[in-house]
């Protein structure tokens, strides 16, 4: 970041002839927190350094989630709005790996609403304030979580773990079904079977699109 570069430029190599410790007051440096610029500086200037494992919400939430998949993608914090946010959400919902991201309490309900519209039956795991006094977790479909979270206290920092997209047959997914050149009623039956939604609701959505 600009601030990291500015601080490093104000230092000389003599600074690093002493034992220097860089810590974060919450989370782990370099993981959605500053720190990577300092590590790169040390590498380029041949300054010996070490990294000690610390609190990591990603791995803790992964272990807590109960999902059996062994691979995941980490998306950090999403953009607040705009095309880039919508595009990233599509990437997440089409990812064949578990998706993990961070979200603030101010935008969590918005995220759940977006997910519930795009894929109401996708299973989501939410972890709040991991390792802290008010730690809590929830696991349900995106639609159920959105409805639940309208009425509860969502203060605190959140980790969101999203189940990979489901495929059927020869890696056939919902987008493949929607793109088939078949009657909407048949599409509706196939999608309803895959997602658990009612045929009537799916058919209506297909007509609207």
Cite the ranges covered by each PLM segment:
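Short, acidic/turn-prone active-site loops that include or flank metal/cofactor-
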Residues: 1-5, 55-56, 76-81, 129-132
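Class I S-adenosyl-L-methionine
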Residues: 1-50, 59-60
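Short, hinge-like loop/turn segments at secondary-structure boundaries
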Residues: 13-15, 38-39, 65-70, 118-119, ...
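A contiguous loop/helix-start segment that scaffolds small-molecule binding in enzyme catalytic cores
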Residues: 18-19, 98, 102-209
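Short beta-strands and strand-loop turn motifs
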Residues: 21-25, 71, 75, 125-128
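General beta-strand structural signal in soluble alpha/beta enzymes
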Residues: 24, 51-54, 101, 126
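Class I SAM-dependent methyltransferase SAM-binding "motif I" and its flanking Rossmann-like core
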Residues: 37-95
């Amino acid at each position: 970041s600009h601030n990291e570069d500015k601080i490093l430029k104000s230092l000389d190599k003599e600074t690093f002839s002493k034992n220097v410790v860089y810590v974060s007051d919450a989370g782990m440096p370099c993981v959605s927190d500053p720190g990577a610029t300092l590590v790169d500086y040390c590498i380029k200037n041949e300054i010996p350094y070490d990294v000690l494992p610390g609190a990591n919400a990603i791995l803790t939430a992964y272990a807590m989630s109960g999902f059996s998949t062994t691979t995941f993608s980490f998306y950090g914090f999403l953009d607040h709005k705009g095309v880039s946010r919508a595009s990233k959400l599509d990437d997440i919902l089409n990812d064949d790996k578990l998706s993990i991201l961070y979200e603030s309490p101010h935008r969590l309900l918005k995220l759940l609403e977006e997910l519930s519209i795009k894929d109401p039956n996708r299973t989501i795991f939410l972890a709040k304030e991991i390792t802290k006094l008010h730690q809590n977790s929830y696991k349900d479909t995106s639609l159920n979580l959105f409805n639940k979270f309208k009425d509860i206290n969502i203060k605190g920092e959140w980790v969101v773990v999203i189940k990979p997209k489901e495929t059927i047959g020869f890696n056939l997914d919902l987008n493949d079904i929607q793109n088939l050149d078949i009657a909407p009623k048949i599409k509706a039956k196939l999608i309803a079977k895959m997602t658990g939604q009612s045929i009537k609701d799916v058919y209506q959505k297909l007509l609207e699109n």
